[in-house]
């Protein structure tokens, strides 16, 4: 894909994938009609990361794609940005941004970790995907844009062929995402509400709609430990749901989360490739490619 700056300057968009986002970078490059730039990644004997961009990128327009689920992945992103010194423009895509949930101080003496991370990104433009707290975008020292994968998830769910599926948010915070996923497909949607009956008895149920005899799709931006989702799955099935599917943007799925969810009775887990897991059945590459095409 070519970006024409002037009559004499033509830049070929260079897509560079970090170690955490190799597949996504390749898919994005293909969506843009190009090939990803080759990189070398290795470890020194003491465990430090070595990387090298194996193609010439000086005076080129480059886009780095790297999720940062671990500290090591964040360091790799910083190294990639530094290795691109001399490029005409550096765009950074952080599909999943670690520390984004630490967007404020909860106790005295704590850092605002999301702010600390964002301030380190020295680029011309940053893209995130369904970042947990949009306020984090204000901390980047450059223009930052949050992309929404809701429409991709909606189309994927529509492909299930379920009769009258109901989309459900596990809490108030996910209502906006669920509404956007349902938009354009006419899906019924609702959210779960906790009602405390006594000191130790809490009932979780949909606020407005009855799940009896319905195919339910629980939707959230991320699934981490799976504890809350597992509880929700059991409650929905006990209330008459035919089956329960899970769909999320970021399949973090720490430790035995997937096992916990299947033990609770989930039929399927669908995530995107913002994180490359076995559950990453849907690619956000078209979303990234479309965003990059606008610049």
Swiss-Prot record:
Predominant localisation class: cytoplasm
UniProt-annotated location(s): Cytoplasm
Active site residues according to the UniProt entry: 194
Pathway named in the protein's UniProt entry: Metabolic intermediate biosynthesis; 5-phospho-alpha-D-ribose 1-diphosphate biosynthesis; 5-phospho-alpha-D-ribose 1-diphosphate from D-ribose 5-phosphate (route I): step 1/1
InterPro entries assigned: Pribosyltran_N, PRibTrfase_dom, PRTase-like, Rib-P_diPkinase, Rib-P_diPkinase_arc
Its EC number(s): 2.7.6.1
Keyword Calcium set for record: no
SMART domains xrefs: Pribosyltran_N
Residue runs in coiled coils: none
Gene Ontology molecular function: ATP binding; kinase activity; magnesium ion binding; ribose phosphate diphosphokinase activity
A GO cellular-component term linked to this record: ribose phosphate diphosphokinase complex
A Pfam family this chain is assigned to: Pribosyltran
Stored CDD domains: PRTases_typeI
GO biological process, one term: purine nucleotide biosynthetic process
Residues noted as binding Mg(2+) 1 in the record, renumbered to the chain: 132
Binding site for D-ribose 5-phosphate: 196, 220
Cofactor needs: Mg(2+)
Keywords assigned: ATP-binding, Cytoplasm, Kinase, Magnesium, Metal-binding, Nucleotide biosynthesis, Nucleotide-binding, Transferase
Superkingdom, taxonomy of origin: Archaea
Catalytic activity, reaction form: D-ribose 5-phosphate + ATP = 5-phospho-alpha-D-ribose 1-diphosphate + AMP + H(+)
Chain positions recorded as Mg(2+) 2 binding sites: 171
NCBIfam families in the cross-refs: PRK00934.1, ribP_PPkin
Family to which this protein belongs: Belongs to the ribose-phosphate pyrophosphokinase family. Class III (archaeal) subfamily.
Protein name: Ribose-phosphate pyrophosphokinase
Source species of the chain: Methanosarcina mazei (strain ATCC BAA-159 / DSM 3647 / Goe1 / Go1 / JCM 11833 / OCM 88) (Methanosarcina frisia)
Gene: prs
């Amino acid at each position: 894909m070519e970006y024409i700056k002037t009559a004499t300057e033509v830049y070929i968009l260079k897509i560079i994938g970090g170690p955490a986002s190799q597949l996504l970078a390749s898919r994005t490059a293909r969506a843009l009609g190009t090939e990803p730039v080759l990189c070398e990644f290795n470890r020194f004997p003491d465990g430090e990361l070595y990387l090298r961009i194996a193609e010439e990128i000086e005076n080129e327009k480059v886009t780095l794609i790297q999720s940062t689920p671990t500290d090591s992945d964040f360091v790799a992103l910083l190294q990639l940005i530094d290795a691109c010194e001399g490029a005409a423009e550096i765009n950074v895509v952080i599909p999943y941004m670690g520390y984004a949930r630490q967007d404020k101080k909860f106790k005295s003496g704590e850092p605002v970790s999301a702010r600390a991370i964002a301030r380190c990104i020295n680029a011309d433009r940053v893209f995130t995907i369904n970042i947990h707290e949009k306020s984090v975008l204000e901390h980047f020292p450059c223009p930052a844009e949050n992309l929404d994968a809701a429409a991709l998830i909606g189309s994927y769910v529509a492909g299930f062929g379920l009769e009258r599926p109901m989309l459900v948010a596990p809490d108030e915070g996910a209502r906006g995402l669920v509404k956007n996923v349902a938009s354009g497909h006419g899906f019924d949607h609702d959210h779960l509400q906790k009602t405390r009956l006594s000191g130790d008895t809490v009932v979780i149920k949909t606020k407005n709609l009855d799940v009896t005899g319905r195919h339910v799709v629980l939707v959230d931006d991320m699934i981490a430990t799976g504890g809350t989702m597992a509880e929700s799955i059991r409650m929905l099935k006990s209330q008459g749901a035919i089956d329960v599917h899970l769909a999320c943007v970021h399949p973090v799925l720490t430790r035995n989360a997937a096992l916990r969810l299947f033990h609770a009775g989930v039929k399927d887990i669908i995530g995107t490739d913002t994180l490359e897991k076995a559950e990453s059945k849907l690619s956000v590459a078209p979303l990234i490619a479309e965003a990059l095409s606008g610049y």
